[in-house]
Amino acid sequence: MTHILALNGSPRRNGNTETVLNAFLRGAEEAGATCETIRLSSLTFKNCLGCNACHKKGVCVITDALTEVFEKVMACDILVLASPIYSMTVTAEMKGFIDRGQFLWAQKFKTQTLVFDEEHLKNHIGVFLSTSGQGLPIMFDAAFPVVRALFNDAGFSYTENVLFAGMDEHGGVKAWPESVEEALTRGKELVQRVNEP
Protein backbone atom coordinates (compact mmCIF):
# COMPACT_ATOMS: atom_id res chain seq x y z
CA MET A 1 0.00 0.00 0.00
CA THR A 2 1.28 3.46 -0.91
CA HIS A 3 2.26 5.52 2.13
CA ILE A 4 2.35 9.31 1.96
CA LEU A 5 4.18 11.55 4.40
CA ALA A 6 3.15 15.20 4.25
CA LEU A 7 5.24 17.86 5.96
CA ASN A 8 3.24 21.03 6.52
CA GLY A 9 5.52 24.05 6.71
CA SER A 10 2.77 26.59 7.34
CA PRO A 11 2.77 28.20 10.80
CA ARG A 12 -0.97 28.90 10.48
CA ARG A 13 -3.66 26.44 11.45
CA ASN A 14 -6.55 25.86 9.05
CA GLY A 15 -5.20 28.36 6.54
CA ASN A 16 -4.97 28.10 2.76
CA THR A 17 -2.07 25.65 2.64
CA GLU A 18 -3.36 23.31 5.32
CA THR A 19 -6.81 23.27 3.75
CA VAL A 20 -5.66 22.30 0.26
CA LEU A 21 -3.13 19.85 1.73
CA ASN A 22 -5.88 18.10 3.66
CA ALA A 23 -7.94 17.90 0.46
CA PHE A 24 -4.99 16.45 -1.47
CA LEU A 25 -4.49 13.78 1.20
CA ARG A 26 -8.20 13.03 1.33
CA GLY A 27 -8.13 12.30 -2.39
CA ALA A 28 -5.06 10.13 -1.92
CA GLU A 29 -6.78 8.14 0.81
CA GLU A 30 -9.82 7.65 -1.42
CA ALA A 31 -7.45 6.05 -3.93
CA GLY A 32 -6.13 3.67 -1.27
CA ALA A 33 -3.08 5.42 0.19
CA THR A 34 -2.25 5.77 3.87
CA CYS A 35 -1.30 9.29 4.93
CA GLU A 36 0.52 10.94 7.80
CA THR A 37 0.90 14.69 8.31
CA ILE A 38 3.53 16.40 10.43
CA ARG A 39 3.21 20.11 11.21
CA LEU A 40 6.74 21.44 11.39
CA SER A 41 5.64 24.43 13.48
CA SER A 42 4.55 22.06 16.25
CA LEU A 43 8.06 20.61 16.58
CA THR A 44 11.03 21.89 18.53
CA PHE A 45 14.19 21.60 16.45
CA LYS A 46 17.47 23.37 15.85
CA ASN A 47 18.62 24.83 12.58
CA CYS A 48 21.61 23.43 10.72
CA LEU A 49 24.83 24.55 12.44
CA GLY A 50 26.89 24.52 9.27
CA CYS A 51 29.50 22.54 11.18
CA ASN A 52 30.07 20.05 8.32
CA ALA A 53 30.42 17.18 10.79
CA CYS A 54 28.07 15.16 8.58
CA HIS A 55 30.62 15.43 5.76
CA LYS A 56 32.87 13.03 7.67
CA LYS A 57 30.44 10.37 8.91
CA GLY A 58 27.19 11.18 7.10
CA VAL A 59 25.35 11.71 10.38
CA CYS A 60 23.91 14.93 11.80
CA VAL A 61 25.31 15.81 15.23
CA ILE A 62 21.93 17.23 16.28
CA THR A 63 19.39 14.87 17.82
CA ASP A 64 15.93 16.39 18.19
CA ALA A 65 12.41 16.13 16.75
CA LEU A 66 13.69 16.13 13.17
CA THR A 67 15.69 12.95 13.74
CA GLU A 68 12.49 10.88 13.73
CA VAL A 69 10.99 12.98 10.94
CA PHE A 70 13.88 12.12 8.62
CA GLU A 71 13.46 8.44 9.48
CA LYS A 72 9.84 8.72 8.33
CA VAL A 73 10.89 10.60 5.20
CA MET A 74 13.17 7.76 4.18
CA ALA A 75 10.44 5.17 4.81
CA CYS A 76 7.57 6.74 2.82
CA ASP A 77 6.63 6.24 -0.83
CA ILE A 78 5.40 9.76 -1.57
CA LEU A 79 6.75 12.83 0.19
CA VAL A 80 4.68 16.02 0.14
CA LEU A 81 6.40 19.26 1.08
CA ALA A 82 3.64 21.79 1.72
CA SER A 83 4.39 25.45 2.30
CA PRO A 84 2.85 28.83 1.59
CA ILE A 85 5.08 31.36 -0.12
CA TYR A 86 6.61 33.80 2.36
CA SER A 87 8.96 36.46 0.92
CA MET A 88 9.02 34.62 -2.41
CA THR A 89 10.06 31.20 -1.07
CA VAL A 90 9.13 28.52 1.46
CA THR A 91 8.55 29.35 5.12
CA ALA A 92 11.28 29.43 7.76
CA GLU A 93 9.92 26.17 9.18
CA MET A 94 10.23 24.37 5.87
CA LYS A 95 13.63 25.88 5.05
CA GLY A 96 14.93 24.87 8.47
CA PHE A 97 13.85 21.29 7.83
CA ILE A 98 15.40 21.23 4.35
CA ASP A 99 18.69 22.66 5.63
CA ARG A 100 18.87 19.89 8.22
CA GLY A 101 18.79 17.40 5.33
CA GLN A 102 22.40 18.30 4.57
CA PHE A 103 23.45 14.98 6.09
CA LEU A 104 21.66 13.19 3.25
CA TRP A 105 23.67 15.20 0.72
CA ALA A 106 26.80 14.24 2.66
CA GLN A 107 25.87 10.56 2.52
CA LYS A 108 25.46 10.80 -1.26
CA PHE A 109 28.48 12.88 -2.17
CA LYS A 110 30.95 12.77 0.73
CA THR A 111 30.73 9.35 2.38
CA GLN A 112 29.02 7.84 -0.70
CA THR A 113 26.95 5.54 1.49
CA LEU A 114 23.56 6.55 0.07
CA VAL A 115 22.75 5.39 -3.45
CA PHE A 116 19.36 5.35 -5.19
CA ASP A 117 18.87 3.17 -8.25
CA GLU A 118 16.38 3.82 -11.04
CA GLU A 119 13.82 1.45 -9.52
CA HIS A 120 13.90 3.33 -6.22
CA LEU A 121 13.48 6.70 -7.91
CA LYS A 122 10.63 5.35 -10.03
CA ASN A 123 8.73 4.30 -6.91
CA HIS A 124 9.38 7.35 -4.73
CA ILE A 125 7.60 10.56 -5.71
CA GLY A 126 8.18 14.09 -4.45
CA VAL A 127 5.27 16.57 -4.41
CA PHE A 128 5.52 20.31 -3.76
CA LEU A 129 2.19 21.78 -2.65
CA SER A 130 2.04 25.52 -2.22
CA THR A 131 -0.20 28.57 -2.04
CA SER A 132 0.58 32.25 -2.52
CA GLY A 133 -1.34 35.42 -1.82
CA GLN A 134 -0.25 37.17 -4.99
CA GLY A 135 -0.88 35.82 -8.45
CA LEU A 136 2.33 36.82 -10.20
CA PRO A 137 3.68 34.14 -12.56
CA ILE A 138 7.02 34.11 -10.69
CA MET A 139 5.58 33.47 -7.23
CA PHE A 140 6.90 29.92 -6.87
CA ASP A 141 10.12 30.20 -8.90
CA ALA A 142 12.49 30.69 -5.96
CA ALA A 143 10.94 27.79 -4.02
CA PHE A 144 11.40 25.16 -6.73
CA PRO A 145 15.19 24.67 -6.38
CA VAL A 146 14.90 24.63 -2.58
CA VAL A 147 12.45 21.73 -2.47
CA ARG A 148 14.21 19.99 -5.35
CA ALA A 149 17.40 19.88 -3.28
CA LEU A 150 15.66 17.90 -0.53
CA PHE A 151 13.85 15.59 -2.94
CA ASN A 152 17.10 14.81 -4.77
CA ASP A 153 19.07 14.16 -1.59
CA ALA A 154 16.34 11.96 -0.08
CA GLY A 155 15.80 9.87 -3.21
CA PHE A 156 12.46 11.16 -4.51
CA SER A 157 11.62 11.89 -8.13
CA TYR A 158 10.29 15.45 -8.02
CA THR A 159 7.50 15.18 -10.57
CA GLU A 160 4.50 16.95 -9.06
CA ASN A 161 3.64 20.58 -8.29
CA VAL A 162 0.25 21.37 -6.78
CA LEU A 163 0.18 25.16 -6.82
CA PHE A 164 -2.47 27.75 -6.08
CA ALA A 165 -1.49 31.36 -6.75
CA GLY A 166 -3.60 34.47 -6.21
CA MET A 167 -5.26 33.43 -2.96
CA ASP A 168 -5.71 37.09 -1.97
CA GLU A 169 -7.52 37.87 -5.21
CA HIS A 170 -9.85 34.92 -4.67
CA GLY A 171 -10.52 35.82 -1.05
CA GLY A 172 -8.67 32.80 0.32
CA VAL A 173 -9.38 29.12 0.05
CA LYS A 174 -12.80 29.37 1.72
CA ALA A 175 -14.00 31.61 -1.10
CA TRP A 176 -12.28 29.48 -3.75
CA PRO A 177 -13.80 25.98 -3.44
CA GLU A 178 -12.41 24.99 -6.83
CA SER A 179 -8.92 24.94 -5.30
CA VAL A 180 -10.00 22.34 -2.76
CA GLU A 181 -11.67 20.26 -5.45
CA GLU A 182 -8.57 20.41 -7.64
CA ALA A 183 -6.30 19.40 -4.75
CA LEU A 184 -8.50 16.42 -3.94
CA THR A 185 -8.51 15.32 -7.57
CA ARG A 186 -4.72 15.70 -7.86
CA GLY A 187 -4.16 13.56 -4.77
CA LYS A 188 -6.47 10.84 -6.02
CA GLU A 189 -5.02 10.81 -9.54
CA LEU A 190 -1.43 10.66 -8.29
CA VAL A 191 -2.04 7.57 -6.17
CA GLN A 192 -3.99 5.93 -8.98
CA ARG A 193 -1.05 6.48 -11.35
CA VAL A 194 1.45 5.17 -8.82
CA ASN A 195 -0.62 2.03 -8.26
CA GLU A 196 -1.08 1.24 -11.95
CA PRO A 197 0.42 -2.18 -12.80
Where are these regions (language model features)?
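N-terminal beta1-alpha1 ligand-phosphate binding loop
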Residues: T2-A31
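Cofactor-binding loop segments of dinucleotide-utilizing enzymes, especially the Rossmann-like FAD-
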Residues: G9, L40, T131-G133
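Short histidine/acidic/glycine/proline-rich micro-motifs that form metal-
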Residues: P11-N14, I85, G133-P137, D168-H170
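Glycine-rich phosphate/pyrophosphate-binding loop and the adjoining helix
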Residues: E30-A31, I138, F144-P197
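A short beta-strand-loop structural module common to alpha/beta enzyme folds
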Residues: A33-L43, V162
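N-terminal beta-loop-helix "entrance" segment that forms/cooperates
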Residues: L40-V59, D168-W176
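Helix-loop-strand module that forms the ligand-binding subsite of alpha/beta enzymes
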Residues: V61-N152
